[in-house]
Swiss-Prot record:
It comes from Aliivibrio fischeri (strain ATCC 700601 / ES114) (Vibrio fischeri). It is an enzyme of class 3 (hydrolase). Homodimer. Substrate binds at residues 19-28, 110, 137-138, 214, 252, 362. The gene is astB. The lineage of its organism: Bacteria, Pseudomonadati, Pseudomonadota, Gammaproteobacteria, Vibrionales. Its EC number is 3.5.3.23. Keywords: Arginine metabolism, Hydrolase. This is N-succinylarginine dihydrolase.
């Protein structure tokens, strides 16, 4: 085994629904109150994981959150039995119940930020769960996210787990959706690239006007310090506020990177020429930028198709594959541009699309669904092996989903006490399948 970039995808939870909770995420709001299909959603995610496993990539699975989150609803003043808490919250504040029932943890690009051992001062892999304070429904995730990460990467000889940053607007952190890493080989020192939307302390920085900037410069700097990153190999850049106002709520909706390649839109960053120069200076010779011009692909097309919310991955033969949502194939302008790219041989060699409709309608493409974790040979062996995709796990999880998941959920179903029973039964069995221990509040 050699050092690899593994992908750990989030398993879609049993309460997957369309509550339109994410302001600034156009797909999420436009599908609000639609009827979701959790069983189809989890199977679409599993199909993507299995396909990458079959291609020879190291593919892991991260467990979902416990939802509905009865513990949080009790903290917010709803009392009685669990079924009474559900009934009262739906009666008096259906928005709170929806927020506490969200399956948004499927998008593990927001689970946290990961720095490989080649980049850190102590030579260990560092994890920091994202606090996600910009959206209430996601701000209640980080404690259990930390539990899941610790159960997946438990060996203290190789892995270091930090607490989420303080829950404050000053340190708004959205995890790996605003972070990428460039390197020549995965096991060598890389350049870690942090993208922020605003500065909390310095008012001279520009900021979006219509939609919130979810990541602060101060949060990104704090994570770089916490992970022990080397200053000369760390680059901070500001996302273009204008594209945030057009629905680009995370950097991974307008740019994606891998090894020596940055694939981004022409309007992705503020002072884009300087950003490219800073990255090239830190990386050295051979840094490759594929910049998509606005006259080829508009920001609107990029957001609607999630062109950049794709996975750039290097195959065993050294060629680069891009994993795209099926929406890209269905947009003639985007698909024509992608095929031009492949013909030009400028760093992307192969296109592969997946049908991720259930996730896409809630505002998350292929890149949202995965957390990248670079692992050397010893670290791969130290991972909880029961969380790694295999023929057996794929079959087991599909049968598990058939047993526990509904094929239809609408808003009123979130108040059904039976959904809570079903969800907890599913998660209890999942922790046994994946050998995670008691990671959920209901198991304590």
């Amino acid at each position: 085994m050699k050092t690899v970039e593994s992908n750990f995808d989030g398993l879609v939870g049993p309460t997957h629904n369309y509550s339109g909770l994410s302001v600034g995420n156009i797909a999420s709001k436009s599908n609000q109150s639609g009827v979701s299909n959790p069983k189809q959603a989890v199977k679409q995610g599993l199909e993507k994981m299995k396909a990458l496993h079959d291609m020879g990539f190291v593919q892991g699975v991260l467990a979902p959150q416990e939802r509905p989150d009865i513990h949080t609803l009790r903290r917010l003043g709803f009392s009685g039995s669990d079924s009474e808490v559900l009934k009262k919250s739906y009666q008096y504040s259906p928005q709170l119940l929806a927020a506490c029932s969200s399956a948004s943890s499927m998008w593990t690009a927001n689970a946290g930020t990961v720095s490989p051992s080649a980049d850190t001062a102590d030579g260990k892999v560092h994890f920091t769960p994202a606090n996600l304070i910009n959206k209430f429904h996601r701000s209640i995730e980080d404690q259990v996210t930390g539990n899941i990460l610790k159960a997946t990467f438990s060996d203290e000889e190789h892995f270091v787990h930090h607490q989420a940053l303080p829950h404050s607007d000053y340190f708004g952190d959205e995890g790996a959706a605003n972070h990428t890493r460039f390197c020549r080989e995965y096991g060598e020192q890389g350049v870690e690239f942090f993208v922020f939307g605003k500065s909390a302390f310095n008012e001279s920085y520009l900021a979006p006007k219509k939609y919130p900037a979810r990541q602060t410069l101060e949060a990104s700097e704090a994570i770089a310090r916490t992970h022990g990153l080397r200053e000369q190999f760390t680059v901070f850049a500001q996302q273009n506020p204008d594209v945030i106002d057009q629905g680009v709520f995370h950097n991974d909706v307008i740019a994606v990177g891998n090894k020596n390649t940055l694939f981004c839109h022409q309007q992705a960053f503020l002072n884009q020429e300087k950003v490219k120069s800073d990255l090239s200076d830190s990386y050295g010779s051979g840094f490759n930028v594929i910049e998509v011009p606005t006259d080829k692909v508009s920001v609107q097309d990029a957001v609607e198709t999630y062109l950049f919310n794709s996975q750039l991955i290097t195959k065993a033969d050294g060629t680069t594959l891009i994993i795209l949502p099926e929406h890209c194939r269905q947009n003639s302008r985007v698909w024509a541009y992608l095929n031009e790219l492949v013909e030009q041989k400028c760093g992307i060699d192969e296109l592969h699309t997946f049908d991720l409709k259930q996730s896409m309608q809630n505002g998350g493409g292929p890149a949202c669904l995965r957390l990248r974790v670079v692992l050397n040979e010893a670290e791969q062996k130290a991972v909880n092996q029961h969380t790694l995709m295999s023929e057996e796990l794929f079959t087991t999880l599909n049968l598990w989903a058939d047993k526990h998941y509904r094929d239809r959920i609408e808003d009123k179903d979130l108040a059904d006490p039976q959904l809570l029973v079903e969800s907890r039964a599913a998660l209890d069995e999942l922790t046994q399948i994946m050998h995670l221990g008691s990671i959920y509040p209901f198991q304590k």
